[in-house]
Amino acid sequence: MESAFGRRPTDQNRQRQPRRPERTRTAQITVEAVFPAAPLERNARVVTALTGLLAVLLPLALLLAQPGGRGLLVLVASPALLVAVVALPLVLSPAGYAVGSGDLAVLRRGTRPLLFPLGSLLAARQTAMPRSLRMLGSGGMFGWWGRFANRDWGRFKAYATDRRRGVLLEWPQGLKLFVSPEDPEAFCRAVLARSGRKGRR
């Protein structure tokens, strides 16, 4: 068994309840099963490649176009641009999902996992992510992560690499999470087995 430390995020809907939990809480879980994230879908690969290329070529073009001191300023600012456009989305992007100790951990590539309780899980079903409005997060750069909204699901969180084949998890108070494990069916079985509910698949 392995252990993982992570943060337990809170949802805006939870903040309206009389007993409001802490905004973040560090917790440890014993990992019982790990599900790698699905390969990055084609659209995301294109967005990632083009954005990364633009982040490299744009400063070079500006450097060549600016004389003297201005060119030096562009050169100094280039690393900050690369961090903002490329490194930050990579660090926060999903790498996989771990299940155990009554929690689901969303494993991220460069920072602590996010933990979601499985004991109160209402349903888990295989589905595709509909066209959605990105409210905060990444809309294809190394995947889809952050807060989104659409007409059918309302507001939800996503940590996915493939919108076509994923799993929608639902909790009380309207909390929804879309993920894209490589094996959605096995993932559904694992989370439902630890939720104490049959749920939908």
Label each PLM-derived region with a short phrase.
Residues P67-A80:
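Hydrophobic alpha-helical transmembrane segments
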